[in-house]
C-alpha cells in the first residue's frame, strides 16, 4: 500500500512563515504613523479609531484607489520603494479636496508568491505616505494567492477614512463667476495615464533606465511618487475661503475640473501660465500624442486646481509657496451655459 504524502499549506504555495516575517518587518514603520485616536495595536480582527474631539458635527469621508499600471512599470524596473507613497496619495488627495483630514488608512497587498523584501519595501512606502499626510496606518491584508498572479507580481489597493466638520465641507457649491483658479504643481504623471506611458515606451523602443531627461534617467521622472498635498491644503482651508478643489487624476483637465463646478459656470485655463515639465513634453513627442489627448490623460504638471475669491489669491499663493508647493494663478471661473465646461487657451 502506497503511503500518502502529507501536504502542507506551503506545498500549496502559501507560506505562513513569510507572512509572519513580513508583519515583524513592518511593525516599526507602521508604529510611527500612529495617531492619538487609534486604539489598540496591529493584529486585531479590526482596527479601532475614535473621532478627534475638536469636531462638533463630524462627517466621515471615505475613499479607495490603486496605482493603476504604474505598478507594472515599477515591477518591470524592480523599483518598489515609492509605490506605497503613490497608493496613499491617490486616496488622501481625494479626501482633502472635500476639506477632510485623513484619519486612518488600510492597504491590500495581493501576490502569487510573497517576497518579504518587496512587500516590506511597498508597505514602508505606504507608511511614509501616511506620515506625509498625517494619517495612521491601522491595518491591512497581505494575500498570497498562488495561481492568481504570475510569479512574484503583485497588486495593491488602499482605503482611507477622513473627517470634516459638516459646515466646512467643500463641495463646489460656492464657486461663482470671477473666482480665480490656483494650480498646485505635480511631481510628474503621478499615478495616471501609465497604460499610455507604457505604450509610448513600447512603440518608441526607449529604455527608461538609460534614457536621460533633464539630467536624470527617464525612469526617475516616470516613477516619481505622487505628491501628497494634504498638509498644505488643510492649512489653506483653515486660513482662506476655498470654494472648490479638483484633484487631477484619470481624465485629466477635461473630466476632473467639471466635477466641482456648479451649473452655468466654466473654467477658463490660461495655458501660458505654466510650462509643462520635461517628462510631459517627452511623452507627447515620443508618442505623437495630441494636445487634447495629453490634457485628457495626464495632469501635465498640475496636481490640483483650487477655486477661491480673487481677494484671497495673494494670501493663498503666499501660504502655499511657503509650505513648499509650486503654486500659481492658472485661470478663472466665468458664467457660462456652454456645454464645454473647461476651456484651455
From Swiss-Prot:
One of its GO terms (cellular component) is cytosol. Its main location: cytoplasm. It is an enzyme of class 6 (ligase). It is found in: Cytoplasm. The keyword Coiled coil does not apply. Its EC number is 6.3.3.1. It comes from the Bacteria. Pathway: Purine metabolism; IMP biosynthesis via de novo pathway; 5-amino-1-(5-phospho-D-ribosyl)imidazole from N(2)-formyl-N(1)-(5-phospho-D-ribosyl)glycinamide: step 2/2. SUPFAM superfamilies: PurM C-terminal domain-like, PurM N-terminal domain-like. InterPro entries: PurM-like_C_dom (IPR010918), PurM-like_C_sf (IPR036676), PurM-like_N (IPR016188), PurM-like_N_sf (IPR036921), PurM_cligase (IPR004733). GO terms for biological process: 'de novo' IMP biosynthetic process; adenine biosynthetic process. Keywords: ATP-binding, Cytoplasm, Ligase, Nucleotide-binding, Purine biosynthesis. One of its GO terms (molecular function) is phosphoribosylamine-glycine ligase activity. Belongs to the AIR synthase family. This is Phosphoribosylformylglycinamidine cyclo-ligase.
Amino acid at each position: 500500500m502506497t503511503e500518502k504524502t502529507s501536504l502542507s499549506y506551503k506545498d500549496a504555495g502559501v507560506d505562513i512563515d513569510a507572512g509572519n516575517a513580513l508583519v515583524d518587518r513592518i511593525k516599526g514603520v507602521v508604529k510611527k504613523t500612529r495617531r492619538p485616536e487609534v486604539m489598540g495595536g496591529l493584529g486585531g480582527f479590526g482596527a479601532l479609531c475614535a473621532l478627534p474631539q475638536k469636531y462638533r458635527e463630524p462627517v466621515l469621508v471615505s475613499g479607495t484607489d490603486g496605482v493603476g499600471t504604474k505598478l507594472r512599470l515599477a515591477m518591470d524596473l524592480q523599483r518598489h520603494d515609492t509605490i506605497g507613497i503613490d497608493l496613499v496619495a491617490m486616496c488622501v488627495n481625494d479626501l482633502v479636496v472635500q476639506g477632510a483630514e485623513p484619519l486612518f488608512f488600510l492597504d491590500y497587498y495581493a501576490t502569487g508568491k510573497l517576497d518579504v523584501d518587496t512587500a516590506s519595501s511597498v508597505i514602508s512606502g505606504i507608511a511614509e505616505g501616511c506620515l506625509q499626510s498625517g494619517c495612521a496606518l491601522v491595518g491591512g491584508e497581505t494575500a498570497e494567492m498562488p495561481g492568481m498572479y504570475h510569479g512574484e507580481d503583485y497588486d495593491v489597493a488602499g482605503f482611507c477614512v477622513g473627517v470634516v466638520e459638516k459646515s466646512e465641507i467643500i463641495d463646489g457649491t460656492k464657486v461663482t463667476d470671477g473666482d480665480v483658479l490656483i494650480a498646485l504643481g505635480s511631481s510628474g504623471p503621478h499615478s495616471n495615464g501609465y497604460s499610455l506611458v507604457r505604450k509610448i515606451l513600447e512603440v518608441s523602443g526607449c529604455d527608461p533606465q538609460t534614457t536621460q531627461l533633464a539630467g536624470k534617467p527617464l525612469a526617475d521622472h516616470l516613477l516619481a511618487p505622487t505628491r501628497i498635498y494634504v498638509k498644505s491644503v488643510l492649512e489653506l482651508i483653515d486660513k482662506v475661503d476655498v470654494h472648490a478643489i479638483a484633484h487631477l487624476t484619470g481624465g485629466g483637465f477635461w473630466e476632473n475640473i467639471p466635477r466641482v463646478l456648479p451649473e452655468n459656470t466654466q473654467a477658463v485655463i490660461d495655458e501660458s501660465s505654466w510650462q509643462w515639465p520635461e517628462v510631459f513634453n517627452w511623452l507627447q513627442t515620443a508618442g505623437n500624442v495630441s494636445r487634447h489627448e495629453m490634457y485628457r490623460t495626464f495632469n501635465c504638471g498640475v496636481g490640483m486646481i483650487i477655486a477661491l475669491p480673487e481677494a484671497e489669491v495673494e494670501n493663498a499663493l503666499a501660504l502655499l509657496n511657503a509650505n513648499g508647493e509650486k503654486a500659481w494663478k492658472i485661470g478663472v471661473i466665468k458664467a457660462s451655459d456652454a456645454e464645454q465646461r473647461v476651456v484651455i487657451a
